[in-house]
From Swiss-Prot:
Keywords assigned: Cytoplasm, DNA damage, DNA recombination, DNA repair, DNA-binding
Residue stretches in coiled coil: none
Chain segments carrying region Domain I: 1-64
GO cellular component, one term: cytoplasm
UniProt-listed SUPFAM superfamilies: DNA helicase RuvA subunit, C-terminal domain, Nucleic acid-binding proteins, RuvA domain 2-like
Cross-referenced HAMAP family: DNA_HJ_migration_RuvA
Protein name as it appears in the record: Holliday junction branch migration complex subunit RuvA
Major subcellular location class: cytoplasm
Pfam families tied to this protein: HHH_5 (PF14520), RuvA_C (PF07499), RuvA_N (PF01330)
Organism the protein comes from: Chelativorans sp. (strain BNC1)
Amino acid sequence: MIGKLKGVLDEIGEDHCVVDVGGVGYVAHCSARSLSTLGSVGTPVTLFIETYVREDMIRLYGFRTVLEREWFRLLQNNVQGVGAKVALSVLSTLTPSELANAIALRDIATVARAPGVGRKVAERIVTELKSKAPAFAGEAAGAIGLKQDLGEGVAPAPVSDAVSALANLGYSRDIAANAVAAALKSAGEGADTGTLIRLGLKELAR
């Protein structure tokens, strides 16, 4: 099994790249996010690989970080109806920490933004991975803490709305969720959307 490729970027396609390792070109299928970070042809590149072996083919999936590869495995191994194509679509739309945030906040709509992922599949992703997401949270510690504060239910509308509002102002969902987590601790669980946004912005201004 191939676990990592380190070589020179030889080609970038719509959903894959070719890495030249010692004169041998390896085709690795990647998320759009991974492809966008590879740089130009001819530059050194390292990919963490997930190898699929079937009777009629061997397919390599490449990831820029070990965390992204772990989420690729997690999605397929734990969520019914999610294969490699859907997993790559999710990871093309959301970073690992954004995905962990969405699961922590039970933000089904954010997960459903990925092409080919309807609400039912997004709901399964959120439900099936809610207990596993903390171990793969990456930078999403604020949202994980927020989820623990809220308990097992769906995040109240003011919380989800506040995160979305801060994200619409240009902050990443990671940063927005962390700010709302701090705001919620300060204001209490009964806080409305406006209060959470105001306190969240105050937190971001520090």
